[in-house]
Amino acid sequence: MTEPTQTQPAVAADENQIIAERREKLRALREQGVAYPNDFRPTHHAADLQATFADSDKAALEANPVEVSVAGRMMLKRVMGKASFATVQDGSGQIQFFVTPNDVGAETYDAFKKWDLGDIVAARGVLFRTNKGELSVQCKELRLLSKALRPLPDKFHGLADQEMRYRQRYVDLIVTPETRDTFRARTRTIASIRKFMDNADFMEVETPMLHPIPGGAAAKPFVTHHNALDMQMFLRIAPELYLKRLIVGGFERVFEINRNFRNEGVSPRHNPEFTMMEFYAAYTDYRWLMDFTEQLIRQAAIDALGTATIQYQGRELDLAKPFHRLTITQAIQKYAPQYTDGQLSDDAFLRTELKRFGVDVSQPAFLNAGIGALQLALFEETAESQLWEPTYIIDYPVEVSPLARASDTTPGITERFELFMTGREIANGFSELNDPEDQAARFKKQVEQKDAGDEEAMFFDADYIRALEHGMPPTGGCGIGIDRLVMLLTDSPTIRDVLLFPHLRRED
């Protein structure tokens, strides 16, 4: 059976038959000796060659021959009698191989004609330009390094099934340049953040992933068991309380980029395993944090994309402009101006209005909710999705901010912000609560809520209280969702597009 050509989709053929044919080729290779050799070392990468010799014409390359050793995956092959071409893709890009029996020998040439798309091949040769001007390697030595047993998706149709792209990310990376670009941008973003933090005298640290008590956020944890210690443990939902212990210990500026785990739903914005960057700075407050976070995100965009003006889902977002700042009620009245100050202070009205939006106000989290928590819930229904431009929502109520410092001037309010862009939360920060007695009282309130059925309420962390009792300097802290930030910078509509291996349901 002949393997499908570039115009005959592999999906239309009997894939099992194709695999069987390739296994037979592998069997023949094994009989000849080492089927998967590991003694070839490339000297150049495709993209570097394309960039370095972009201005070298045919005559210049002939006058000054450049010897190269290149390896990669064969993505296209054209056999034309006594001369053949192959497009080879390495980790940086693509380059063309030119293969003739005169250069590589008749035996190698005959073998090459039987190689398949997806095979890992290597060549030593010299650079030249074809008559059409394409930079190519005139192969003097050609080798098969790794036999691919499964066919690649058809060139023109690609990996059309979106779930298959996530499930078989390795294939998606092979055939989809945009996917590779997304994850390179992610790497540049994180590298930029690390550089920015280092320049601001922050120390990168690592804190535990297994916690005896989950804390630092309102979320449902994953539960596991430590056999050696015979104790229940939790995958961390946030590193916050450990990082603030380090502030107590005298490390005045710390940050961590790492995984958090929350045993909650999956959506275009949520994955149970996700990457956060949290940082804490002594002798700062939430206003300093807002200025600092704004500068950090702006610089990350410039380093990742070369500009602070980005396109997201067909709309422009200018990160160079100062970010907006609104209170919760200001945001509600901006995007839902029908609400009066009196209505937004009326418990019964707010509960009725939330019911109209389909919110179950009988659930434990709302049973004893005050005006501030109800206002926040209404904000989430009316304004949050409309916050396209970078906007800090500030001054959150105490009852939904158990770790944030209370305002000195406004009762019931904390020095807290959340940063929204394109209708989604990107960051959350506040002046840290460093009063151990106030913190203990708030933990007790959280325990009461948990006992009442609120699974996301926090536990009482006695050791953290003990740390605060040693004295924590005035501190500001912030968490930035790396995945959501990368979604923004790469114009990705779902979080799965920026996770190499997102969580999926088990295959049937």
Curated annotation (Swiss-Prot):
Q: Which UniProt keywords apply?
A: Aminoacyl-tRNA synthetase, ATP-binding, Cytoplasm, Ligase, Magnesium, Metal-binding, Nucleotide-binding, Protein biosynthesis
Binding sites annotated in the UniProt record for Mg(2+) 2: 425
Residues at which Mg(2+) 1 binds: 418, 425
* Catalytic activity, EC: 6.1.1.6
List, alphabetically, the InterPro entries matched.
Aa-tRNA-synt_II, aa-tRNA-synth_II, aa-tRNA-synth_II/BPL/LPL, Lys-tRNA-ligase_II, Lys-tRNA-ligase_II_N, Lys-tRNA-synth_II_C, NA-bd_OB-fold, NA-bd_OB_tRNA
Cite the cofactor comment: Binds 3 Mg(2+) ions per subunit.
Pfam families in the cross-refs: tRNA-synt_2, tRNA_anti-codon
Reported cofactor(s): Mg(2+)
User: One GO biological process from the UniProt record?
Assistant: lysyl-tRNA aminoacylation
One function term, GO molecular function aspect: tRNA binding
Domain of life according to the entry: Bacteria
Is the Protein biosynthesis keyword given for this protein?
yes
**Location in or out of the cell:** Cytoplasm
Q: Which GO terms describe its cellular component?
A: cytosol
Reaction catalysed by this chain? Answer: tRNA(Lys) + L-lysine + ATP = L-lysyl-tRNA(Lys) + AMP + diphosphate
Q: Which family does it belong to?
A: Belongs to the class-II aminoacyl-tRNA synthetase family.
Q: How does it assemble?
A: Homodimer.
Q: What is this protein called?
A: Lysine--tRNA ligase
Lineage of origin = Bacteria, Pseudomonadati, Pseudomonadota, Betaproteobacteria, Burkholderiales
Q: Which gene encodes it?
A: lysS
